[in-house]
């Protein structure tokens, strides 16, 4: 049962405000003794020409509900205290009946392409790619839970001027045998060497531009090298995605749209939107903005041209209701240009394109950079995390079966959870030892809490006890705190989906884990009495919601640790 919705309905029966406005105004009192929800009457003072405290008193006196133990005015607030027994009983009933589908809802429907991950060919995946990959994956899972059909697109960086540079680098320093032996690292070293040498030899940049022009013109040697670079890179990417448990519905990268750009350029011309500026073909963005470049002065296309073609193609292919681009915050202006140009072309669906930006992962406070070579490779971080998790598991539970699988779930899950617990737009520092700790605000802490709940259920089964299916007669403060969180889960899912913000779910999971651990420490769950079934029902419901929270984040939940 949604108690907040009932508060909204009750208040709505007494005041002339839209329900959406009331919902936004409802607060959680900081002092639990003041109740569970509060409605501030300040907003009504101007229109009703009354003291807010009097308004609150009048509202409270006219409200009554069996689901609330107390509804009273406290100063200018109407405070609602939930009937603890009813919240616990209704919440446990819902969670145990719906299981992993608890929190499913219909906020919308239709296709939602999610442009995510999108590493560059011929460069190893770095920690810099982690954010887009795991944020996009979590958003996809959450959007599906609220009714949409997500389509995960890996818009590979498999075209662009960097390939001219890479081909030039390979022609200068490349060795076919080295590339066959260790393809992606060899190509990466050529790329780093190119930029280092180009600092003292600007002619190299010209060579890179010439090779990219050849690639665009279909030169056989350039095309053959490009295909080879793409093939070996994609194979390596898929290995890492498998580690992360991430799959894609499409790997159509920039190159897929190479033959779809000229029709867009022609369309812009036909609609009178394209004109020349300093030798380039541009679209005006307004008086105070620089124009959006569509074709550079040397005749080559740019990233925006392909994104316009990709957006048009995706609309025709998927008929989307929203399209998300999970791309770093530094690309914000690019997406302003993309949406503005599409709107100028007459496409109102551009309003449903959303840039989902995120901050940087730093190490020691410094930004990671591929070009200069001070890069942290993602596969190495995942290996180190798994090894660190395994070491701790062997110390805590040396007899645990399937240690390798559990260590994988905990290590990889720790890296993913650490990323997602941070607000999407925040920059954060990455310290592996902190990330894989079993205590504190970490993924392993949430996983361990779930494993603890599962252990309680196994011990109960060995005693011949099982969770109650209908009699939930518990009413202690520890149980109420847990049940209150469980009751909030559908609202948490909705908020995460609406804001494209996985951290909402990660923070919820941490809070629920902490409250359950307090319950575990203060209540003798396995005492044989007439409430044991109800206590076990709370344990089972907690495990269901923790497991589902972790799943929505793309993290596995081992039953033993």
Curated annotation (Swiss-Prot):
EC number of the protein: 6.1.1.19
Pfam families according to UniProt: Arg_tRNA_synt_N, DALR_1, tRNA-synt_1d
Family annotation (Gene3D superfamilies): Arginyl tRNA synthetase N-terminal domain, HUPs, Isoleucyl-tRNA Synthetase, Domain 1
Catalytic activity, reaction form: tRNA(Arg) + L-arginine + ATP = L-arginyl-tRNA(Arg) + AMP + diphosphate
Transmembrane portions of the chain: none
Example of a GO biological process term: arginyl-tRNA aminoacylation
Ligase keyword on record: yes
UniProt GO molecular function: arginine-tRNA ligase activity; ATP binding
Enzyme class: ligase
InterPro entries: Arg-tRNA-ligase, Arg-tRNA-synth_N, Arg-tRNA-synth_N_sf, ArgRS_core, DALR_anticod-bd, Rossmann-like_a/b/a_fold, tRNAsynth_Ia_anticodon-bd
Motif 'HIGH' region, residue range(s) on this chain: 119-129
Similarity comment: Belongs to the class-I aminoacyl-tRNA synthetase family.
Listed name of the protein: Arginine--tRNA ligase
Gene name per UniProt: argS
């Amino acid at each position: 049962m949604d108690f907040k919705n009932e508060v909204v309905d009750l208040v709505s029966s007494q005041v002339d405000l839209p329900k959406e406005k009331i919902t936004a105004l409802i607060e959680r009192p900081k002092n639990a003794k003041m109740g569970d929800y509060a409605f501030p009457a300040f907003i009504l003072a101007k229109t009703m020409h009354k003291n807010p405290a009097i308004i609150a008193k009048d509202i409270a006196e006219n409200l009554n509900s069996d689901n609330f133990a107390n509804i009273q005015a406290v100063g200018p607030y109407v405070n609602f205290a939930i009937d603890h027994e009813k919240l616990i009983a209704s919440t446990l009933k819902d969670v145990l009946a719906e299981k992993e589908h608890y929190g499913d809802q219909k906020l919308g429907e239709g296709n939602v392409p999610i442009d995510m991950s999108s590493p560059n060919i011929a460069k190893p995946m770095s920690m810099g790619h982690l954010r887009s990959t795991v944020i996009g994956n979590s958003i996809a899972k959450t959007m599906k839970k609220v009714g949409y059909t997500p389509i995960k697109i890996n818009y590979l960086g498999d075209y662009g001027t960097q390939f001219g540079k890479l081909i030039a680098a390979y022609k200068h320093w490349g060795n076919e045998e080295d590339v066959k032996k260790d393809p992606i690292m060899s190509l990466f070293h050529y790329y780093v060497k190119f930029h280092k040498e180009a600092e003292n030899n600007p002619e190299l940049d010209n060579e890179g531009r010439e090779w990219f022009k050849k690639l665009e013109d279909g030169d056989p040697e350039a095309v053959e090298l490009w295909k080879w670079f793409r093939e070996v890179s994609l194979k390596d990417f898929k290995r890492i995605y498998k580690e992360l448990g991430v799959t894609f519905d499409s790997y159509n990268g920039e190159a897929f749209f190479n033959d779809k750009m000229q029709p867009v350029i022609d369309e812009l011309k036909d609609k009178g939107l394209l004109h020349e500026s300093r030798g380039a073909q541009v679209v005006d963005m307004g008086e105070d903005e620089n124009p959006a470049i569509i074709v550079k002065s040397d005749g080559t296309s740019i990233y925006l041209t392909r994104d316009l073609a990709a957006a048009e193609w995706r609309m025709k292919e998927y008929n989307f209701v929203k399209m998300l681009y999970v791309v770093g915050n530094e690309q914000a202006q690019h997406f302003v240009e993309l949406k503005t140009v599409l709107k100028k072309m007459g496409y109102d669906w551009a309003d449903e394109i959303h840039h989902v930006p995120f901050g940087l992962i730093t190490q020691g406070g410094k930004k990671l950079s591929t070009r200069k070579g001070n890069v942290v490779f993602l596969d190495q971080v995942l290996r180190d995390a798994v090894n660190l998790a395994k070491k701790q598991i062997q110390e805590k539970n040396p007899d645990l079966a399937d240690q390798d699988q559990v260590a994988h779930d905990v290590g990889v899950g720790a890296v993913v959870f650490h990323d997602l617990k941070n607000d999407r737009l925040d920059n954060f520092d990455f310290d592996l030892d902190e990330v894989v700790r079993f205590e504190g605000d970490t993924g392993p802490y949430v996983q361990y809490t779930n494993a603890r709940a599962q252990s309680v259920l196994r011990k109960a089964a060995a005693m011949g006890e099982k969770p109650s299916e209908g009699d939930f007669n518990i009413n202690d403060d520890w149980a109420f705190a847990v049940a209150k969180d469980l009751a909030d889960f559908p609202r948490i899912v909705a908020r995460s989906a609406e804001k494209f913000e996985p951290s909402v779910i990660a923070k919820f999971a941490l809070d629920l884990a902490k409250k359950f651990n307090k319950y575990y420490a203060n209540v003798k769950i396995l005492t044989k009495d007439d409430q044991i079934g109800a206590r076990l029902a709370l344990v089972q419901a907690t495990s269901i919601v923790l497991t589902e929270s972790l799943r929505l984040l793309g993290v596995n939940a081992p039953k033993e640790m």
